[in-house]
Every structure is written in C-alpha cells, then in structure tokens.
Amino acid sequence: MDIKNLLISKAKEIGVKVSPAQAEQFQIYLDLLLERNTVMNLTAITDPEEAVIKHFVDSLTLLKALEIKKNAKVIDVGTGAGFPGIPLKIMRPDIELTLLDSLNKRLVFLREVCDAIGIEAETIHKRAEEAGKDTKLRESFDVATARAVANMNILAEYCIPLIKMKGYFAAMKGPSLPDELEYARKAIASLGCDVVKTVPFILPDEEQSERFVAVMRKLRFTPKMYPRHGGTITKKPLFFCLLYTSPSPRDMRRSR
C-alpha cells in the first residue's frame, strides 16, 4: 500500500475522511520532513509508514475529540515539526493557524512546508511563557493545542494563558495523561479552565498504541501572575496541592 492510500485507510479507522487532494498534501509534507530530518533533528521516526500513523493519524485524533468552530484562531504550542497544527490545517483550511516554537530553524522548515503544500500559517519564534505574557497573544485564541510537550501541570501554564474566554485547550498525550490530569486538576482550575472531557484513542498501528486528548474550557480569566518565568514553571510546577491565591474580581468573572 502506498503512503497516500495508507493514510486514507488509517485515518478512516479513527473516523476521519482524508480526500485524495489532502493525502497529496500529506505526502509532500512527509517527503520534506524525512528529507530535512537528515540535516536537522525533526523526528525520531524515520519509517514513512510509521510516521503516517504516529504523526499524521495521531494528529487527526484532535478532530474527533474537539469540535472546532469555523474560522477559529488556533495556536499549536511547541509545534516542533508541525504536529498537530499542520495536519489540522490541511483538514480544516478555514482555521487561522499559528505555529509557536522556541527554535527558529524549525519554523523555517515549517514555512517551507506551508509554501510547498499551499497553506497559510503564522509562525512565531518565542518561548511559550513569553507568548503568554505578550498582550498581542494572551487570551486571543479560540483553541490552544500541544502534543506531548511536557507534564500536564507544566503544559497547562504554558497554554491556558493564550486562550480566550470560552476557548479550549486540547492536550494530546499518551497513556500517562489520565494520571497527569488528575494531579494537575487544581492547577488547571487556578489558571482559569475546567476539564470538559478526556477522549481515549487506539492508534491503528501494530502496537495498538494508546493515546488521549484532554479537552479543557476557559471559564475564568487567567490571573496576571501566570505564566511565570520559564525556569520557575519547570523547577516549581503547579502541583495538585497548589495553594490558590484568590484573584481579582475581574479574574473571577465568568463569561455568560
């Protein structure tokens, strides 16, 4: 089975329909990924068929976990080689996609991919905690997503400040997610979100790999103290036993 037919078939197994034209875009993306990976560190997965499932199909699980409104502003935090942002944009060309990463050379590669497959996306060279303090980016996205970037209590502090009221944060992770989510639940609440659901998936690979998408919705403004400095976020992450400092009335105000 060739790569395009493999993608169409495997995506169908998770309930996502990929058209031949979209499969062609994914093929170009994969070719560039594997070619550029020989000179820069983009992915540890170098087998084309494995990459189709563990990068492309895995990214597409987001479409089944979260209903994204038309023309939504979506930011992919710590996008790396473009997952899940670029697969999402291929399938949903209406969204306004922003790709955020701390390494500029990755963003150069992603701009090359976007040009090659004919999609538009904004690339931003910033650390996530810097983006969360930027008034042009803070609380301005309908959806923030991240794929296996960090533990949930750290990831939440990176991503939640970027989403607007009633927006969603979708975290994509492996089998550890349910335990991480329980541990981080109070931290997530302190940042302004409530956990809506956790959606399990089994990837259609030989290992039947287990994946989860945790969906959180923003119902309170994120207190201005978050995100903290990057070193503090990782050295002193917000734990389950977080002592929550009461925010201002504005921070507590719920959207109606």
Identify the role of each PLM range.
Residues 244-251:
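Conserved small/polar residues in nucleotide/adenosyl-binding loops
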Residues 167-173:
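Conserved beta-strand signature within the Rossmann-like core of class I S-adenosyl-L-methionine
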Residues 182-243:
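SAM/dcSAM-binding transferase cores
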Residues 60-150, 156-157:
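Conserved SAM/SAH cofactor-binding pocket of Class I
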Residues 3-69, 112-119:
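Class I SAM-dependent transferase core
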Residues 46, 125-127, 197-199:
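Short loop/edge segments at beta-strand edges and connector loops
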Residues 156-166:
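A short glycine-rich, Lys/Arg-flanked "PGG" loop and its adjoining helix->strand segment in the class I
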Residues 129, 174-178:
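Short "lid" loop at the C-terminus of a central beta-strand within the Rossmann-like core
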